[in-house]
Amino acid sequence: MTAPLLIVDFDGTVCRGDAPVRFYAARIADALPPAAAREFLAATERYLSRGPASAAAAADTVQAAALREALDSWGAVLALAARCYDVPGPVIAEAFAQCRAAMIDPACEVGLVGPLMETLADLRRDVDVVLVTNSPRDSMLPLLDRLGITAAFDDIVAGAAKPDGLRRLLQRRLGPDLRARPWRLCSVGDHYRNDIEPAAEIGAAAAYIDRFGRADGPATARARRVEDLLPVLRAWAADPEGTTRLAALAGRDGPG
């Protein structure tokens, strides 16, 4: 019998902290005129501080929409650059590549969430733990090596093209009856559309790290920090079919 499957996101889940996002934004700002660069970086900082609520202080309605609609800080930087400052796609992509390269350097502050990693180590006795990230494999694997967590997962799927890439992965791993037996899956992450929706839509357990209290859609449990969701992950791994009890363990509302 195939083991239950725990899908784990990387940015904002396994690792936390805004230093890499600030580096990404700074590299994009290098391509802007000085005044525009200052405005762009200021808008980025507002999002990092207040999330979608930062739209209230936006300079114009386009910026407000970009901030309000961004599902995470990486998306906010991308949306600001593309929608508000017309930064070309190749420039944005190069800035992201430089950011990922910088994260491999020990000098770059990358905050590994230790309690989560300890929990994953325990859960691997009962479930398959798979890291699924949209970041390219050629930069992700060296970063995992730097952090010493390459062996912490049963499988690593980089360049996953979530959310649809995650949906395809679930079909391959769980088979055609994934909707009939959704209890075999739990997904944890901080990007609702990429990490949570593909699980929630088939009735599987979904643990949403909702940093800014967005409440984007249904989830088994949500909390602002992944540490507050660890009891949910442990309970699911211990009794995957008992997912109806999981929301109470997070101390947050479940579906809704």
Task: State each model region's role.
Residues 1-3, 117-121, 130, 135-256:
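Asp-based, Mg2+/Mn2+-dependent phosphohydrolase catalytic module
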Residues 7, 101-130:
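Short, acidic loop-to-helix structural element flanking the phosphoryl-transfer center
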Residues 20, 112, 162-166:
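Phosphate/oxyanion-binding active-site loops and adjacent basic polyanion-contact surfaces
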Residues 32-44, 85-97, 151-152, 178:
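Short, surface-exposed acidic
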Residues 45-103, 121:
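A metal-dependent, Asp-based hydrolase signature
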Residues 21-29, 41, 74-79, 137, ...:
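An amphipathic alpha-helix signature
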